[in-house]
Amino acid sequence: MARYRCCLTHSRSRCRRRRRRRCRRRRRRFGRRRRRRVCCRRYTVVRCTRQ
């Protein structure tokens, strides 16, 4: 599986991996279709890069 890094607005210098535990709710709504672009809403996401 591919790993994604999300760059957050409150810490632009650092990119953190999205945490699945907090993203469970978002997962159910979108499913596999928009799974790649969607990250945790708690963080204000700027970019998600595939690595």
From Swiss-Prot:
GO cellular component, one term: nucleosome
Subcellular localization(s) per the UniProt record: Nucleus; Chromosome
BP terms from Gene Ontology: chromosome condensation; sperm DNA condensation
Covalent S-S links between cysteines: 7-15, 40-48
InterPro entries: Protamine_P1 (IPR000221)
Origin superkingdom: Eukaryota
Keywords noted in UniProt: Chromosome, Developmental protein, Differentiation, Disulfide bond, DNA condensation, DNA-binding, Nucleosome core, Nucleus, Spermatogenesis
Primary residence: nucleus
GO molecular function: DNA binding
Tissues in which the protein is found: Testis.
Pfam families tied to this protein: Protamine_P1
Family, per entry: Belongs to the protamine P1 family.
Purpose of the protein: Protamines substitute for histones in the chromatin of sperm during the haploid phase of spermatogenesis. They compact sperm DNA into a highly condensed, stable and inactive complex.
Record note on quaternary structure: Cross-linked by interchain disulfide bonds around the DNA-helix.
Protein name per its UniProtKB record: Sperm protamine P1
Record organism: Capra hircus (Goat)
Lineage: Eukaryota, Metazoa, Chordata, Craniata, Vertebrata
